[in-house]
């Protein structure tokens, strides 16, 4: 045997071993734990407590964990479109945290991003009206630099939103009976602890149980699948290529069901599937991650890198590039009122028109350093910068329709999540997206050395001080700085601010460079003009010569964001106004 053949055999062995382990697990399915079903929270005033706990992932394998209202994960929150809700999140952890309502269309003050810190032994209580379509969302911590640790420790839960259009369809919706939540994750347990920032995540769990067994009735069953992993992608399917129908993605139902035997689910993504189990009473089957079929460059595939270099320890994880069981199902008797057919149509999906876009923004992913391994390991920058809590990277006008174009100049595929909105995927590396990706999405896969374009509209919420986030949902990448911030600004609310009886007008809006014009009544002569950024820091001071209330200044090198211009007149009156800067 030559050296290349020997190396190939060594690389193949762990993947064959993973398949063997999965098959053995199926043969001894009596040892499988039952699928845990998270309890449900409903109503207009919901209590969540983020707490420490312990969890037994396997006999004699009890580890410290985090959870909402329990030891691991959290309850499923059920909401109705149009209802008002207050979500009271109490933090009993020893650390700072936040809670983000992933995928939901809420104001930036209610979004739960890194600026909405919840200190230990305090409660954060966002209130909002549910505007979203019927879909599957989720919630999880989002503190900058803390997300991967707290999610890995177990802090996450599912959100189900219902609406009148979905309620009118003949679909399974009896929770835990024919409408099953599945939170798919992999964990690494090292030295009796859950390990973070590691490629050793070889423990496969669904709803916190290790490759469990679910009982489902012999009828059409709905599976709400959430990839809650830190990094691993799952190429979903069922044994023997049993068909399923995709009926919904991140932000809502599709226009019609799509028959499939495989579907790629990246971290942060959700998908709703229907499986028709009519006539299968007494049978069993398994959901499989067919990760041997993933293209290289995706974490979970056989290879990440260029064949000469890869992630540290990547080839030591038997799951990488292997097919493995996620969970199995035992088919029981049908319910008294079973769903036995799949509707031919669901709800209209009216995508945004590319011709209506007001602006295209470009985002390029590159490694922070120049070493070859950093093309694989990172940290990764967006447009040449790591996340800075004090920098607003983009300023978006309220009501604008925009194309966001992502270019990935790294050796790793990135799932990119945009807060606030749902978007339509226009193309990926110049090719149309998968047919099941043509609905509403808030996570888009950007392949290694490839690109993706999405289109969306920014409606309803504007805030001149509190940003939304966009970031990679590989949580280690996010924590290391592969994240940016954007403000949504109402242009009609910018430019005039009263100070007592004095007003000032500032233009052009938005400002980029050159002369910034100021006009305010009753000012004459030389006066100091101060510019402050959204955090109150002085970024520019100059003297302007006012003639009959008008003057101009020439600020330079202002980063995109919101600014205040302030002038103290000789009679002690403060004249101020706000303006936005865009590149």
Question: Across the structure, where does each feature detected by a protein language model lie?
Answer:
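Surface-exposed, short loops/turns at beta-strand junctions within beta-sandwich domains
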Residues: 132-133, 278-281, 462-464, 523, ...
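A short tyrosine-centered beta-strand micro-motif
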Residues: 137, 285, 563-566
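C-terminal substrate/ligand-recognition segments
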Residues: 362-425, 442-465, 471
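C-terminal outer-membrane/trafficking sorting elements
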Residues: 1-4, 11, 20, 495-583
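Conserved structural position at the C-terminal beta-strand
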Residues: 143, 289, 474, 567-569
